[in-house]
């Protein structure tokens, strides 16, 4: 009975489900009703499960406790006697021992425990004094708010307040840094915006009044939308309040002031609404401007108009404003693009970051407004550039790129003085003096040049390499001459079978050039690779024991080893193993000669059977040997069925063909060892990996060794 009770409690608490199994819970209640000893035993088992470091186990155990608490007086007496420990395990009232993970299950456990304790106090508080005292302790000492949805204790609220203060401090420091950055970069941003606006004025020289820098793009877009023809009449061109009419005999030259004023009248004629002059404008200047163009004939003459008898219709394109890139505005466009690139890549992200920092901190409202204004100005500059619709010239870009490429090519060349006595072309009658062959006729050269050019270059390169005594080709030629001369000069009789076999093996053996490793072959004590130290005769800095010879391990290793570069051609493996696996699939490994699981790779059909009869017979023999080694009664599946029927362990796990993977004890519970896939966890996995730590330790040791070697003779550093 005790074994059955412990098994039921273990299964119920380790199920990992939010609700208990009703059938098993019914069996547990039945066992607890049988005797008080079983009830006490169940209480001890439940308290043991409540001490587990897993919130899901504690939650299931608490649900069982709640069921038994409402039904048994004996269980209530046992629980109230250990009520403080129960509160620490279910509510986490002890600050030093909070509830274990997972966090969601711990939160549900705390909420369920608070509701249960409050209900127990209302129902059984008068009969059980310790229960009422525990409720009073939670409410008044631990400051637990039973109406709080999150059911937080005083310690938890303090922790959250400290966490919030820490976040506020971080946001405040970030806002302070943003304030300093803003004070440093505001002037630079203003200069960049001014440069962009000046470039825009040079590209689109519209004059629409005193506020043209703020409205010329908006006015131009408004004109493009209302592309109706506007009639121009001399009445519109006549200044208001002039009161003068009739021709004027004197011809006055057109000056810059006339052009500016005329531009104002032309803008009003085509429908551009220029804003009214400011109230603070000087009235004397206004009177002078009206008096200068009081005569309509002078106005017509300055604009190239003949008479008042015709009208002008001005049609604006509907596709908006366009700027054509040419040689005149190329420098301005380059300057504007550089400034806009600086705005887009540096200033605008920085300003957006300032706005976010000031918003999170909730302070520096003036700086926040200034940052928002800067952001709007930067975005407006980018929008203006998009509205320009700059069309690159046809040949402008190609000419610019060609000019830059030519400048780079000129910079790559280095001026070298001409060699004295150098003749770029040798005459035909002097070729014999230089040891050159006479030139072939032109027809012969034209005939054979295309065929023999590659072969001739290859042959000349080989001859040049062979002529150099320090090259590998010259060494190979010398070795070939040495090997061929004794074989050609010596005349031997017929060779015996052993000598013939040795000669055949020598012929098949690869030729290895002579090296340092062959020079010291078989020598145990090498004379080379030793460092000889000269004996010093000074009596002060001479050590007591002097090693006259020091062996260098690196040099000794070089004398015994040789690095040979593979000069062959890599051929990828095309075939597969295709052996039949236990799951019915074919092995897809692409080893060259031997599969590590199925042995030598042989040709097989689509079912994994060998195509060669010899291989098929060999595999059948191997299968028979395996069957003899493992009888049929040792089949893992058969043994598992017998174990399930009899309840006796026959050792089926020992004969199982599966790997020795560690089986989880409670697979339904959340694995606490599996960490959340967060950025911090991934960084910790990489930074604190065993290999990374070893590399860091090796680098630090190397730094210390270098420092020691550099300052070992100085007592000031040697003592540190």
From Swiss-Prot:
Gene assigned in the entry: Uvssa
Signal peptide: none
Alphabetized InterPro entries for the sequence: ENTH_VHS, UVSSA, UVSSA_C, UVSSA_N_a-solenoid_rpt
Biased composition (Basic and acidic residues): 282-301, 602-621
Top-level taxon of origin: Eukaryota
Protein name as catalogued: UV-stimulated scaffold protein A
UniProt modification remark: Monoubiquitinated at Lys-419 in response to transcription stress; this promotes efficient transfer of TFIIH to stalled RNA polymerase II.
Function: Factor involved in transcription-coupled nucleotide excision repair (TC-NER), a mechanism that rapidly removes RNA polymerase II-blocking lesions from the transcribed strand of active genes. Acts as a key adapter that promotes recruitment of factors involved in TC-NER. Facilitates the ubiquitination of the elongating form of RNA polymerase II (RNA pol IIo) at DNA damage sites, thereby promoting RNA pol IIo backtracking and access by the TC-NER machinery to lesion sites.
A GO molecular-function descriptor: RNA polymerase inhibitor activity
PANTHER family from the UniProt entry: UV-STIMULATED SCAFFOLD PROTEIN A
Location in or out of the cell: Chromosome
Record family assignment: Belongs to the UVSSA family.
Positions of the UniProt region annotated as VHS-like: 2-145
Record cross-link Glycyl lysine isopeptide (Lys-Gly) (interchain with G-Cter in ubiquitin), residues: 419
One CC-aspect GO term: chromosome
Residue ranges of coiled coil: 169-198
Residues reported in the UniProt entry to bind Zn(2+): 577, 587, 595, 598
